Structures are given as C-alpha cells and as structure tokens.
Amino acid sequence: MAHPVMTFDKPSSASPKISFVSLGCPKALVDSERIITRLRAEGYELTKSHRGADAVIVNTCGFLDSAKAESLAAIGEAAAENGKIIVTGCMGAEPESLQTAYPDLFAITGPQAYESVMEAVHAAIAPPDNPFTELVPPQGIKLTPRHYAYLKISEGCNNRCSFCIIPHLRGDLVSRPIGEILQEAEKLVSAGVKEILVVSQDTSAYGVDLKYAETLYGDRTLRSKFIDLARELGSLGVWVRLHYIYPYPHVDAVLDLMAEGKILPYLDIPFQHASRNVLRAMRRPGDQEKTLSRIEEWRKLCPDLTLRSTFIVGFPGETEDDFQILLDWLSEAKLDRVGAFKYEPVADAPANDLDLTPVAPEVQTRRYQRFMEHQQKISARRLREKIGKHVSVIIDEASPKAAIGRTKGDAPSIDGKVHITTHRPLRVGDIVKVKIEAADAYDLHGKAV
C-alpha cells in the first residue's frame, strides 16, 4: 500500500527537492518517517513532483510478489520522469533483481539503511549550506495524522516461518534500548499524540536479543523486556496498542495491564491457521486447542478484549479437511477482527522446498471466499453485542454534526470504524463516549453522549 507523503513549505527557493514514495506496512512507514526527518533536518524540500525533483526515493515492500510488483511499478513511474532514483526498503535487500529490471538506478540500499540513503541523497544533490533544523519537530516528522503514531521497537525476527522471508530481508531480531523507545514515546505524547501503535516484526520477543538487559532511565532501573516496556508505555496516559504479537507463553502477562486499563485491550496475533498439519508445514505453533483455552482465559481476565488475527488459506498441502478444521476453529475462537490472504509463493521462502502439493488457484479463491463469509458472520455477531453500550471512541474525522472514529478495539486502516452523530462539535483526536445504536458487518453506528 502506498502511503501519502506530505509536502512542506519551502525553507528557501534554492533548496534541493526530493520526491518520496513510501510503500508497505506500518514498519516501513516508520522507516520513511526517519528518512524524511533527516532530509528536512538537512534542509531538503519534499515535493510531490518526480519530474521537478533533484532525486526520488522509493521505499519498497518485498514481502509478497504482489507487493514487489507494486514496488517495481512505482520505481518505473519515477524512472520515467527522473534520472536519479534511490531505492530502499525490503526490495533493496535483493539488488540484483532491481538492477535487472532497472539498470540505471542511481542507488540501491537495503531496509533500515538510513545512513546509506542519506549518502546516496548527498551524492545526487548536496544539502544546502544553511539547513532549517528548526522546521523539524522534536518528535520527528510523522506521516500519520497528528493524533496517532507508530512506534517501532525492534527490527528483524528470530522465527523461521516457512512462508516468510523477513529474516532474509531484515535479519534477526535487534531490539532498541528501552530508554530510547521511551524517550521517543514521551516526545510523541508531548507533541499531542493520543494513540501509540507499537510495531515490529515480532513485538512480544522484544528484549530477547538484549538478554533483558537492565538500563538506568532517569532514577529508575528498567529491564529491556516486553512486559516491562508495555508497563512503562502504559504509564504515559495515552492509548497504547500492541501489534504483531507472536503467541509466546509470556504474552499472557500483558492481559493484567489490559484489565487495569494501562494499555488497550487489543491483541493483534497472526495465528495463520488451525490445522496441525498446515501449522507444522508453516513452522508455526501447532496446538490450537491450547490456543483456544488461552483465548478463553484471556477473556476471563479482560472481558473487553478485542482479538485481531490474520490467516493464510491455500497453503501448499492444505486439504479440504485442513480447511474445515480452520473454519471450525474460527467458530470456537470467535475472533473480533480477522484478515486473510491467499498463499503466494515467495522467492527464497523455505515453503518452496517443502515438496507439498500446491493448492490450485481456483480452490484458493473458493476457500478464501468461504473463509471471509464465515468470519464475517462471527465478526458481525461480536459487533452486535456492543449495541446499547457506551464505548470510548477516538475521533479520526469530524464535521459539524457527524464524525468517524475508532473504539479501543479498532486500529487505523485495518479494522472497523464508528460512525457518530453529534449535537456538539468534535475535533480530530478527541476521545469521547459514544452510545452504540447499530452495527453492520464491520462498523458501528452511534451517538456522542
């Protein structure tokens, strides 16, 4: 998905101009924000025009072949209008394929290679002598609306799921120091951010590579550990939402913080499948009966918990029995928010070497449709249970007599919305109480109280 990149007032008519294209997930968006912050700190101007820019940066996604195709198309569009194209991001980890498609690229860097990107920019067009560093806010430049922001806590992943090439592209887990994360979070809160969305490739593994090292932060000693980080973020007085949670046993401990209202009662856990056979082939945890028991315990500890997950249908070797196990599991789990993907073979993924029978594309499509229809009914029932309740909603869009927002159970872009009628003006970023009056397949409807 392409993320719009804002433009800024010119610091000087002579300022060098950079056009920027940001593709991919929220983790890639954070990388784009860091690069753009550096550009602005050095006095570069951002422009929407490839043709009028001194160079173009394309931050690519390479997780799936469809994402690679989108990235290549974006590079092609830029190359048609500009001779200095700098490619970074996940596709940059495989420069040979990029050079084959576009041999005249100015520079290629890998993911999170911020210094290499800036070196390429300097080679393309030198920065001005008098940068306007005062134009850069303390929290850095964000590409999200002012009231929420993504906070990336680590890079890479130690898991080796057979369908995934993230470790190949971004390496093993590298956690940021806990003090550095908290400093960034505090700057975001000071800048008016009302919701922090915690992201990484494997959020619940935070600190494993650091061996949970202790750090002096202010007058406190903090451990670089998932639960400790969650507790500290939960003390900042804003909404804190956890994404990309691998279901390790220690995740259970975070439910206490949710029940206490410290962090949002929301878990984004990609379960991926429910059949033991398929999960084994995926190299994922395979005891979904135990997972059902954990979900039941989580909901006892935190009755307001929202569970979001993603699944892959049509994985090589998936039989009709395997798929039915998945549907039956969904009926028991009663997850609130669910997304699904049809399996795509990805170059260099271990799944390519499993010697399993591919699922025919037409079978994949039918199973995907059945999956979505099945889960839609479950999600709709879960939403109808909220009718008549008063819920907290953060406002994303506002007009004089109406607004659109999200509950604590809804992340931006991927989950549902609340359509609100109101007799008083609401502002973007407000957190208000709304009485839910109706629900449809994905969204809620209510009145501000």
Swiss-Prot record:
One of its GO terms (molecular function) is protein methylthiotransferase activity. GO terms for biological process: tRNA modification. Its EC number is 2.8.4.4. [4Fe-4S] cluster 2 binds at residues 157, 161, 164. [4Fe-4S] cluster 1 binds at residues 25, 61, 90. It catalyses: L-aspartate(89)-[ribosomal protein uS12]-hydrogen + (sulfur carrier)-SH + AH2 + 2 S-adenosyl-L-methionine = 3-methylsulfanyl-L-aspartate(89)-[ribosomal protein uS12]-hydrogen + (sulfur carrier)-H + 5'-deoxyadenosine + L-methionine + A + S-adenosyl-L-homocysteine + 2 H(+). Belongs to the methylthiotransferase family. RimO subfamily. This is Ribosomal protein uS12 methylthiotransferase RimO. It comes from Beijerinckia indica subsp. indica (strain ATCC 9039 / DSM 1715 / NCIMB 8712).
